[in-house]
């Protein structure tokens, strides 16, 4: 219900947006045509009726008709929500999933190293890079990398495919082309997240390394690597596991600004256009999906915390 209400808050509706767009093109829409469009799309009904129909249709697998008019479509209302999402969902999950894997694979070892080698040259270097990654805006980093890739590596920038493979069916060559374009958005999307996770891991591990049980184990001659990995890391990683709650929705939404700057065919620009054009069915379903994934992600993070840290138990009295 909250997702549906949020989409209904702006003044006007998708037909009004369509009328404004056609007026700018010099092709005004008559009042009769606008009324027929509203009746066809069900926008002339009361809000509670539209909500009940929306829920009922979704339960039957009908997500509705998209109102968007992007990228050369001749007329609006010509694609269903399923068709719009099918074009973007797979690429969004692939890009964000790849970014998350790279981020965690790099951030956790670096955070452990920085804590174990506190005040070393490597610690200072990674600390500087971490703060720089948090300070530089994603869209600015994207623009810089696009220039570097085009000027020094002679690589086409913008999007995830070259022009020859954009509309081509999937093949090994298309996958190679995707991988060659994937590094720029992966670096841009992963920089701030990697820097943040490095700082969290380092600070948490430093807190654990100063506790009495670690000092006692070190005094008894425990091996340094075993001493760090066996207990302090398992405790210090708990806050990182808690971030799984927002990792799942990020697989769908991605970064809207970065996707627009890099012209990525992901869900971010679709969600932005849907909100701007008041595409109630498309935007409402995406927001609903993000909310459901947030709840599922939070549940998964709680379960993982209970498995990783034996001190956490969910019991009833």
Label for each model-derived stretch:
Residues 1-49, 153-174:
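Hydrophobic alpha-helical transmembrane segments of membrane transport/permease proteins
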Residues 2-9, 128-160, 188-194:
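Membrane-water interface segments at the C-terminal ends of transmembrane alpha-helices
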Residues 13, 58-62, 66, 251, ...:
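A short secondary-structure junction motif
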Residues 28-62, 262-274:
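Short hydrophobic, aromatic-rich alpha-helical segments embedded in or entering the lipid bilayer
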Residues 31-45, 76, 127-136, 184-190, ...:
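Hydrophobic alpha-helical transmembrane segments
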Residues 32, 46, 50-54, 80, ...:
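Generic alpha-helical secondary structure signal
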Residues 43-108:
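An internal, D/E-rich "acidic patch" concept
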Residues 89-94, 98-122, 138, 154, ...:
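Alpha-helical transmembrane segments of integral membrane proteins
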């Amino acid at each position: 219900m909250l997702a549906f209400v949020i989409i209904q808050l702006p003044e006007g509706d998708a037909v009004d947006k369509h009328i404004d767009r056609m007026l700018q093109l010099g092709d005004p829409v008559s009042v009769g045509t606008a009324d027929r469009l509203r009746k066809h799309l069900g926008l002339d009904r009361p809000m509670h009726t539209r909500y009940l129909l929306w829920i009922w249709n979704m339960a039957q697998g009908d997500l509705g008709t998209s109102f968007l008019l992007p990228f050369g479509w001749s007329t609006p209302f010509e694609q269903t929500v399923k068709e719009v999402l099918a074009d973007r969902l797979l690429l969004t999950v692939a890009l964000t999933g790849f970014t998350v894997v790279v981020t965690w694979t790099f951030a956790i070892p670096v955070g452990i190293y920085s804590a174990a080698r506190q005040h070393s040259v490597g610690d200072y270097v990674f600390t500087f890079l971490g703060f720089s990654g948090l300070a530089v805006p994603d869209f600015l980093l994207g623009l810089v990398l696009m220039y570097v890739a085009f000027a020094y590596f002679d690589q086409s920038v913008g999007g995830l495919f070259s022009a020859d493979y954009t509309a081509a069916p999937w093949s090994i060559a298309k996958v190679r082309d995707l991988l060659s374009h994937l590094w720029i958005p992966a670096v841009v999307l992963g920089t701030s997240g990697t820097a943040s996770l490095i700082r969290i891991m380092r600070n948490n591990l430093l807190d654990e390394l100063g506790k009495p049980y670690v000092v006692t184990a070190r005094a008894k001659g425990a091996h340094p690597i075993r001493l760090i990995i066996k207990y302090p890391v398992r405790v210090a990683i708990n806050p990182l596991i808690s971030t799984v709650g927002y990792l799942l929705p990020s697989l769908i939404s991605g970064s809207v600004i970065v996707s627009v700057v890099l012209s990525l065919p992901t869900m971010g620009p679709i969600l932005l256009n849907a909100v701007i054009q008041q595409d109630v069915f498309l935007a409402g379903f995406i927001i609903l999906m993000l909310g459901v994934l947030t709840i599922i992600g939070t549940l998964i993070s709680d379960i993982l915390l209970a498995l990783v840290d034996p001190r956490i138990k969910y019991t009833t009295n």
